[in-house]
């Protein structure tokens, strides 16, 4: 496995690589969810590149950029064991040099859910991902379903800007008890971690009601909210039943509906989602 530290070196490497390239963009502190993306790339692509970059521009002024968990030595060992060919781990100064002043601003898909609660977040995400696509020139890029809104926005960006990359989504990887894997889970106390299982239970409630032929979004949304509110440690940010292509809130749920939830447990904010069909 080769480690690349600079943009110039990565661009030079691209000219030397033969065969399809798969990109797994990460912010490090890897878990099994990231490794599932690596395995998907290994199945389809001759060359797999993983990036490790904690992107400051997608964090708000009162968010956890400085506290975001980092362990590069551990990450590198995990990626090497997973068979990654190249790791791109640039510095903030190289990705955003002095005078940097160009941004990719997503459109309507950022106006709800995460975008409404975290202003500017998706501008930072789209800008750094566009830069990674331009620097690495992957044939495919792999993202997890847990950040579903991010996946939709990046897929739209790649299409709108004619970026020659296929944006792929892989299912959420969960712990045995249903908690969606997230680098931020490390922030949780034992009690908060137990409380956080309520997000998964709320999603299962939505799917169960849909399976029982309940199609009224208002009814399902209330049941989901009741499940989460029953946990005293949970502070809800949103409970959404949205069309999976547009993220528009649904009045009547269908096989094209996705349930999305976000809540805070102590100082830790978690998100999760589930397709109803």
From Swiss-Prot:
Entry protein name: Pantothenate synthetase
Q: Where does beta-alanine bind?
A: 58
Q: Which UniProt keywords apply?
A: ATP-binding, Cytoplasm, Ligase, Nucleotide-binding, Pantothenate biosynthesis
**Pfam families xrefs:** Pantoate_ligase (PF02569)
Quaternary structure per UniProt? Homodimer.
What is the protein's species of origin? Dehalococcoides mccartyi (strain ATCC BAA-2100 / JCM 16839 / KCTC 5957 / BAV1)
- Record-annotated residues binding ATP? 27-34, 144-147, 173, 181-184
Q: Which residues form the active site?
A: 34 (proton donor)
**What other remark does the UniProt record contain for this protein?**
The reaction proceeds by a bi uni uni bi ping pong mechanism.
Q: Which family does it belong to?
A: Belongs to the pantothenate synthetase family.
Localisation = Cytoplasm
Enumerate the catalysed reactions.
(R)-pantoate + beta-alanine + ATP = (R)-pantothenate + AMP + diphosphate + H(+)
A single Gene Ontology biological process assigned to it is: pantothenate biosynthetic process
Location, primary (coarse class): cytoplasm
Pathway assigned in UniProt:
Cofactor biosynthesis; (R)-pantothenate biosynthesis; (R)-pantothenate from (R)-pantoate and beta-alanine: step 1/1
Protein's job = Catalyzes the condensation of pantoate with beta-alanine in an ATP-dependent reaction via a pantoyl-adenylate intermediate.
> HAMAP family recorded for this chain?
PanC
Q: Does the keyword Nucleotide-binding apply?
A: yes
Q: Does the keyword tRNA processing apply?
A: no
One GO MF term attached to the UniProt entry: pantoate-beta-alanine ligase activity
Which positions bind (R)-pantoate? 58, 150
One GO cellular component term of this record is:
cytosol
């Amino acid at each position: 496995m080769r480690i690349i530290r600079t943009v110039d070196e990565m661009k030079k490497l691209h000219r030397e690589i033969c065969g399809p390239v798969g990109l797994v963009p990460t912010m490090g502190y890897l878990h099994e969810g990231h490794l599932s993306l690596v395995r998907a790339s290994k199945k389809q692509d001759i060359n797999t590149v993983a990036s490790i970059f904690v992107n400051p521009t997608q964090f708000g002024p009162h968010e956890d950029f400085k506290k975001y968990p980092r362990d590069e030595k551990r990450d590198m060992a995990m990626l090497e064991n997973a068979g990654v060919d190249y790791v791109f781990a640039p510095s903030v100064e190289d990705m955003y040099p002095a005078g940097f002043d160009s941004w990719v601003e997503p459109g309507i898909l950022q106006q709800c859910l995460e975008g409404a609660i975290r202003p500017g977040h998706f501008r930072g995400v789209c800008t750094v991902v566009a830069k990674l696509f331009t620097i690495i020139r992957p044939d495919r890029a792999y993202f997890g379903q847990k950040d579903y809104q991010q996946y939709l926005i990046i897929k739209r960006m790649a299409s709108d800007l004619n970026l020659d990359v296929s944006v792929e989504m892989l299912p959420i990887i969960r712990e045995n008890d249903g908690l969606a894997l997230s680098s931020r889970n490390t922030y949780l106390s034992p009690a908060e971690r137990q409380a956080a299982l309520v997000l998964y239970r709320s999603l299962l409630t939505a799917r169960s009601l849909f399976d029982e032929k309940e199609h009224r979004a208002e009814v399902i949304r209330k049941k989901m909210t009741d499940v989460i509110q029953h946990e005293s440690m949970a502070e809800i940010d949103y409970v959404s039943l949205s069309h999976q292509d547009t993220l528009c809130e649904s009045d009547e749920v269908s096989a094209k509906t996705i349930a999305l939830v976000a809540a805070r447990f102590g100082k830790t904010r978690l998100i999760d989602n589930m397709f109803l069909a």
